[in-house]
Each structure stands twice: as structure tokens, then as C-alpha cells.
């Protein structure tokens, strides 16, 4: 299973299309701040969540999905105040038995872990702060492990990665 996660494209589909033209994905999740017509995302197979600009009532604020026995959370993060701390997101994740939480909003790619829950920000696919190039995340899952790579959306070079064994060790 291969999953794409991107965030904060802010009106640009160029980088997303570049990734989609070079990889095949079983699922695609967008973490908000799309600023494009929702039908343009639907025709690309994107499952989206609300961002903070612009507000779109057609999207959920938080999307919780169980995929191959792993509980994922997909959220923009602004309602969890992720710009300041991961505490609210961590408490929400614990309450909902989340294994891996993906969030956006900050435009900064990062991987964190707290008490066995992984917090992944894929960065911004079109307006990055850190690193200085557009990024997205690719999840590759099999029966024993979950490999998550944050990649440059243009060159596909790996910026950060983590391998999580399904028995809970990384």
C-alpha cells in the first residue's frame, strides 16, 4: 500500500501533479489550505480535510482512518494549535487511539514521536518554510512495517524518513 500525504498547496496544483505523474498511489490525503476547487482535488482522488484558509464546510476538520490495522489521523492542525505545540494534537490522538497523526498548517516538515504516537508534518507542497523546497510525505505499508518518507516534491530526494514496525518499535 502506498499513500501520498500533502498539505498547504495554496492554489497551486503544479507540484502535486508532478508527484502524481511520477508515482502510483493507493490513497491520497490532503491536509487543507487547498485554495482550489474541490472538484479538481476529487478528480485526482484526494481525500481532504479543512484548512484555515479558505474555510470549506464540505471537508471534515479531522479525518480518522484505519488502514491495514493502523489508526491514522489527518488534520490541518490549526484547531489543535500546532503552530505553538503538539500538546492538543497529542491529547486528541491519545483519546482516539491514533497511531500516526498527520498535520499541516506550519509549512514545516517534521517527524516527532510521543508515547508511541507519531506526529508527521509533510511540510508545504507549494509554499514551504522549512525546508526551503516543496515537500510531501509518502507512506509505504506492508504486513510488518510502515515506512514514511518526507520527500522533495520536485526531485524526490528524501528529506526525512522513519520506519515503524507494526509491533510498535521503530
Mark where each language-model region is.
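N-terminal active-site segment of His-dependent metallophosphoesterases
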Residues: 1-44, 54, 60-61, 69, ...
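Conserved beta-sheet core of the metallophosphoesterase superfamily
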Residues: 45-47, 82-143
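Binuclear metal-dependent phosphoesterase catalytic core
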Residues: 15-18, 67-68, 96, 120-170
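Generic beta-strand structural signal
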Residues: 30, 66-67, 113, 141
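Conserved beta-strand segments of alpha/beta enzyme cores
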Residues: 2, 45-47, 71, 118, ...
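Helix-adjacent hinge/juxtasegments
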Residues: 49-51, 58-99
Amino acid at each position: 500500500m502506498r499513500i501520498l500525504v500533502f498539505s498547504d498547496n495554496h492554489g497551486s496544483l503544479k507540484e502535486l501533479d508532478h508527484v502524481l505523474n511520477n508515482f502510483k498511489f493507493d490513497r491520497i490525503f490532503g491536509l487543507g489550505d487547498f485554495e482550489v476547487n474541490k472538484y479538481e482535488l476529487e478528480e485526482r482522488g484526494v481525500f481532504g480535510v479543512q484548512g484555515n484558509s479558505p474555510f470549506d464546510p464540505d471537508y471534515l476538520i479531522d479525518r480518522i482512518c484505519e488502514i491495514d490495522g493502523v489508526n491514522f489521523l489527518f488534520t490541518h492542525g490549526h484547531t489543535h494549535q500546532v503552530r505553538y505545540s503538539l500538546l492538543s494534537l497529542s491529547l486528541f490522538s491519545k483519546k482516539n487511539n491514533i497511531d500516526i497523526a498527520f498535520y499541516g498548517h506550519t509549512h514545516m516538515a517534521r517527524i516527532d514521536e510521543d508515547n508511541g504516537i507519531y506526529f508527521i508534518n509533510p511540510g508545504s507542497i507549494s509554499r514551504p518554510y522549512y525546508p526551503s523546497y516543496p515537500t510531501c510525505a509518502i507512506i509505504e505499508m506492508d504486513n510488518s512495517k510502515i515506512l514514511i518518507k518526507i520527500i522533495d516534491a520536485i526531485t524526490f530526494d528524501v528529506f526525512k524518513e522513519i520506519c515503524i514496525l507494526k509491533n510498535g518499535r521503530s
